[in-house]
Amino acid sequence: LPYRAADDQPSIEKLLKTLADRYAWTPVFEGENIIAVTKGKYSINIESGGQLELSGAPLNDIHHTQRELKHYLDELRILCKEHGAGILGIGYHPTAPLPARPVVPRTRFEALADQGARHDMRWGFLTCSVQANYDYANEADMIKKLRVGLALQPIIVGLFANSPFVEGKDSGYRSYRYQLNTRTHERQQTRFMELAFSDN
């Protein structure tokens, strides 16, 4: 969806404003542009390519998280149907080319786009993911959880690979998002892995 559109066309702006009006979300603006909505301890933000991001509240277990996600998706599906839009939970946009500028008019995204020569902007504009944060009791517990998470990462990528298409064509990868991530952040990730599994 475009950020802004004619009266009879769907847009991200209209979707967020309707969420705020109908379901008691509080709109967040940058200048005159709505860029997010919040409710209690969670929020819906827009990323640079127009991706919607649910930032959930801290919850006790995965079942509470699932209920929160279902509630969010139920509201979103109703509005998307009314606005003639759809939801696609996928790691990389299957048909869109790389846009020249961010879809969403935010100062932060414009600044990142201006640094595009130093970053692969496909990462910000065309990818989506699930990010999970885990509490820890102490430093030893944190290290253990970090190492387990990193060790399981290739298996998780294989289980949830869902981004085989790029600009309408088969990319040759089951998870093009993972391939792009590896290529974009290879040096940082290599150093991080060395630190995470070092003895000291």
Positions of PLM-derived features:
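Terminal catalytic/cofactor-binding subdomain
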Residues: 1-118, 126
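Loop-rich catalytic cores of soluble enzymes, especially ATP-dependent carboxylate-amine ligases
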Residues: 92-200
